[in-house]
Amino acid sequence: SLVGSEMCIRDRCINEGEVSNRLGLSGISPIAEKIIIERDLSLLSEFPCRYHINQISSQNSLDVIKKNKLNGKKFSVGVSINNISLNENDIGDFKTFLKLSPPLRLEDDRKALVEGIKNGLIDVIVSDHTPEDEESKRLPFAQAATGAIGVETLLPLALELYHNESLPLNKIVECLTINPSNILKINKGTLKKGSDADICVIDLNKPWVVKAGNLKSKSKNTAIEDKRLQGKVLMTFLKGEPVFKI
């Protein structure tokens, strides 16, 4: 599995381009990600195995993935909710809570990734939940810890793409439930008879504002503080037993 940290050179978790130049930070080119994917997919031809690309972030990577899937190679692909909801401009002036791995890319990359979900090139949307203490995120950008929490905001951010008509609801559900379960070969992700009764009850339209202090996570390093969202989980059942309720 190719994970985000393999795509990130130390102290370079910002996209290489206009924003990195303006902020005076060392950037990481999307070509680095593309090269790793090309390498691994070449190895897949020689050594067939189950292979999952955990998080891609660029149009360049999608081009490689499309070519290989059209050639019949079997593998799965994931993308972080951050990379389909935000772009490098959201970093503004050194917003370290948006230092992520893989880094936020161009708006064109974000749109391409959303399209990749829609056409089936990307199979899974992940939270990239990376807890860090706030002090480690409040350092100068190059020294700040990488990552953001994401479990509680994964679904609402994904629903934003539904509300703005970027993605159909069934595709979002598929990428959050059915596909991950199929990849992991576990009996979850559907409501069919015999499946584990892991169920979320959702209000698709409930408005709320992200406040780190109100999140359940012990770590509070959210990348979307004060963001207005629409849609929230009201109840969660695990194997039929209620484990969460607002």
Regions found by a protein language model. Name each.
Residues 20-48, 116-125, 130-204:
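His/Asp/Glu-enriched, well-ordered alpha-helical/loop segment
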Residues 13-14, 66-71, 217:
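Short, solvent-exposed amphipathic alpha-helical segments in soluble enzyme
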Residues 1-4, 8-9:
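Single conserved hydrophobic/aromatic residue that forms the stacking wall/gate
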